[in-house]
Amino acid sequence: MAYYNHKEIEPKWQKYWAEHHTFKTGTDKDKPNFYALDMFPYPSGAGLHVGHPEGYTATDILSRYKRTQGYNVLHPMGWDAFGLPAEQYAMDTGNDPADFTAENIANFKRQINALGFSYDWDREINTTDPNYYKWTQWIFTKLYEKGLAYEAEVPVNWVEELGTAIANEEVLPDGTSERGGYPVVRKPMRQWMLKITAYAERLLNDLEELDWPESIKDMQRNWIGKSTGANVTFKIKDTDKDFTVFTTRPDTLFGATYAVLAPEHALVDAITSAEQAQAVADYKHAASLKSDLARTDLAKDKTGVWTGAYAINPVNGKEIPIWIADYVLASYGTGAIMAVPAHDERDWEFAKQFDLEIIPVLEGGNVAEAAYTEDGPHINSGFLDGLDKAAAIDKMVAWLEAEGVGNEKVTYRLRDWLFSRQRYWGEPIPIIHWEDGTSTAVPENELPLVLPVTKDIRPSGTGESPLANLTDWLEVTREDGVKGRRETNTMPQWAGSSWYYLRYIDPHNNEKLADEELLKAWLPVDIYIGGAEHAVLHLLYARFWHKFLYDIGVVPTKEPFQKLFNQGMILGTSYRDSRCALVATDKVEKRDGSFFNIETGEELEQAPAKMSKSLKNVVNPDDVVEQYGADTLRVYEMFMGPLDASIAWSEEGLEGSRKFLDRVYRLFNSKELVTENSGALDKVYHETVKSVTEQIEELKFNTAIAQLMIFVNAANKEEKLYVEYAKGFIQLLAPFAPHLAEELWQAVAQTGESISYVTWPTYDESKLVEAEVEIVVQIKGKVRAKLVVAKDLSREELQEIALSDEKIKSEIAGKEIVKVISVPNKLVNIVVK
């Protein structure tokens, strides 16, 4: 029996595509352009896993489809290759991280090519290539020139084990680092920052123009966190000092009964009384050991210390105690809050814990029992009494501005981007600090500032990166004899990935980041597919850099990615015991259809979980390609379910996809191809063309494959296969199973050319309509026959067919026909006596 020999056919076509540069990006100016982008991978030592090809297959299907529709298609791949794992490996082994990275890239590329993706490898990029990061550094110098890259002494998330500071977004909810799970402590340090806050409003507003999942837009909106309210100034009793708080509810100022400063607030030491000094110092130290996320956890017990100082509430002159508490962050807002415990749950819990005054200023609720967080008329609020929320806010803001103690204010939760890392394996920041106190950017003609090769990449121990150890590279002298020192921090991994999609457009340009006309031709990216885990960090950073490049005239669009799609996660097979603990697959055996823990004998429940080394349920695509073939993997991952759903891996499903491809192969090896159309497959063929075309456009690949299966089932019932329908089917199959399609195309079309650019088939709307219908024939209201007739016959034609049917003739023999009622396309009712 014929079968699809993937081990022979797939390498054959991969070789053909590579030798013929089949997927080189088209440059025909008369054709429309289509840019399909994957989130490029970090080339880890573990290699590709089966989650990677899901998104890659989706963009590949679109790319192959668009080529056949006459588009120039840009479908590139590259490597996000800077990062901590390579550096950690280098420190552990003494090997160069560049060598480790090159080996990993070679392995990734081998695996990707084995899956038959139609990438234009002439455009391959690598963020660690000096010819690439020259332009990453160039963008930084432009940000620096515009005042958007600056140095600041800021409390950072310091990870001792990693020897570096990490961004807020890289701290997990439990206060450990995303990479490695190490403890994170707060520590003041000189850092490079990027002023992403200058773009907050545009980053927020321009989301409306994007075809992105609403959930991702909401995550960005929440991260940017726009708030409208007022700044209020509180004087500190018996001093000439004051502090400012931001509040979204200035109308509740009469209910402010205490104030809270962040432990790091600049005023804390100056206002703390002698009696409270030790308690305040101890508390500040304890707070420094916690991450921002741990400090602001709503579920944690409230802690704080009174400073011994009082503030004056500007609206009523009352003295209110000033506390410090770790749930207030120096980096958020002004680092100070006014507490209105009657109407805020956190303030109420804090007030109850430390026996502080609670004054209701909104009618409703019982503030002795709980904070009242609904709205209501104002009470205990002097000139605001009786007013609703909106009117009271307006009146209070007007009062604050008239009295010179406050003003209307818009704030954002978004913080400036902590851009420096104290590591070796990253882009050097192109800045020189001179002994006369000035700093300058490395001139463009000296870029790239190449990362020096060294075996000594251990952290310096001073908080600086290992580059601080390399004095030959570090120390420079200006033409006028002034000595300088290069910046030792390196850029975060996010830097190279914030603009890589631009370099694909013109990857070999030595004069500029990319040619303006080419950028105009290809931007914005038409479809960007990747994991939802990048919703905030990568996508927000890339949008920020793109808007900056738009402002300085480098790119022609305001946004980088017009359409975004997040593929779901492929979950692994895993097992849980009665305590819901996960059991590794190598500790499980199957008996009589049930699963048992080999060590304890306990029966286990099968439950999908994220693939992990510890559960030993990671599926390597190399193994799948070896056993089943790349086309099987592609078809299976697209047929598992909706592209955005998280679905468990299944060997049975994989086998089902392989059987489908074998059935396709046998169909073309067992049926005679004919040039005359019998019409038997007209409807199902044209339905298949219509359905697959529409489903590809909508990224509903699972239903497209289901329709291909329907056609195969119908075709198998026929003795012969109309050659034009055979060709059309192969074309529809090609984006999903390109190797098999190429092989079948050569046998059927016999053109000697790849199927990759053959014009996509079209469907005939008139053929989608049923040509025949089934009607019932009744005698005196009882069904006596069912007949298949041509659609839309007249009443007279139906009557004639019914009365001439042999079965009906025998039923009415010898009887008088009183009346015949015909309903086109439905029934004929014969009344006899």
Swiss-Prot record:
Its main location: cytoplasm. The keyword Nucleotide-binding applies. GO terms for biological process: leucyl-tRNA aminoacylation. Disulfide bonds: none annotated. It is an enzyme of class 6 (ligase). It catalyses: tRNA(Leu) + L-leucine + ATP = L-leucyl-tRNA(Leu) + AMP + diphosphate. A motif ('KMSKS' region) lies at residues 610-614. InterPro entries: aa-tRNA-synth_I_CS, aa-tRNA-synth_Ia, Leu-tRNA-ligase, Leu_tRNA-synth_edit, M/V/L/I-tRNA-synth_anticd-bd, Methionyl/Leucyl_tRNA_Synth, Rossmann-like_a/b/a_fold, tRNAsynth_Ia_anticodon-bd. Keywords: Aminoacyl-tRNA synthetase, ATP-binding, Cytoplasm, Ligase, Nucleotide-binding, Protein biosynthesis. Its EC number is 6.1.1.4. It is found in: Cytoplasm. A motif ('HIGH' region) lies at residues 41-52. HAMAP family: Leu_tRNA_synth_B. Belongs to the class-I aminoacyl-tRNA synthetase family. PANTHER family: LEUCINE--TRNA LIGASE, MITOCHONDRIAL (PTHR43740:SF2), LEUCYL-TRNA SYNTHETASE (PTHR43740). This is Leucine--tRNA ligase. It comes from Streptococcus sanguinis (strain SK36).
